[in-house]
C-alpha cells in the first residue's frame, strides 16, 4: 500500500507543471515559451529610412523586464500568453 501511495505521489509531482512559463510572439505568427525568469512579452516598433513606404520595423520577444524606451522607439510590454501580437493582427 505504501508503494502504491509513493508511486502516486511521484507521478503527481512529475505530471504537474511546477512553474508557470510565459508564451510570447517572436514574429507575426510564431511564438515561443520564454526562458525561466523572462516574465514579460514585448513589442518594439521604430521607423527607419523606409518607414513612410514600408511602415515601422517591429521586434517581438520575451524579457525579464520591460526594455528601456529610447527616443523614436515605442515599446509595449505585457505579461499574459501571446499578448504581443502584430498590430495588424490584433482582435
From Swiss-Prot:
Tissue expression remark: Expressed by the venom gland.
Annotated localization: Secreted
Pfam family, one: Toxin_cobra-type
GO CC terms of this entry: extracellular region
Domain of life, per lineage: Eukaryota
Gene3D superfamilies in UniProt: CD59 (2.10.60.10)
Signal peptide region: 1-21
Single GO molecular function: acetylcholine receptor inhibitor activity
Disulfide bonds: 24-41, 34-62, 47-51, 66-77, 78-83
Family assignment from sequence similarity: Belongs to the three-finger toxin family. Long-chain subfamily. Type II alpha-neurotoxin sub-subfamily.
Function: Binds with high affinity to muscular (alpha-1/CHRNA1) and neuronal (alpha-7/CHRNA7) nicotinic acetylcholine receptor (nAChR) and inhibits acetylcholine from binding to the receptor, thereby impairing neuromuscular and neuronal transmission.
Name under which the protein is recorded: Long neurotoxin LNTX28
Organism: Ophiophagus hannah
Lineage: Eukaryota, Metazoa, Chordata, Craniata, Vertebrata
Amino acid at each position: 500500500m505504501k508503494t502504491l501511495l509513493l508511486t502516486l505521489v511521484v507521478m503527481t509531482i512529475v505530471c504537474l507543471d511546477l512553474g508557470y512559463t510565459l508564451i510570447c510572439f517572436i514574429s507575426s505568427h510564431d511564438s515561443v515559451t520564454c526562458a525561466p525568469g523572462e516574465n514579460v512579452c514585448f513589442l518594439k516598433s521604430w521607423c527607419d529610412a523606409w518607414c513612410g513606404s514600408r511602415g515601422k520595423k517591429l521586434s517581438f520577444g520575451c524579457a525579464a523586464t520591460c526594455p528601456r524606451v529610447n527616443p523614436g522607439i515605442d515599446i509595449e510590454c505585457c505579461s499574459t500568453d501571446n499578448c504581443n501580437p502584430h498590430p495588424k493582427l490584433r482582435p
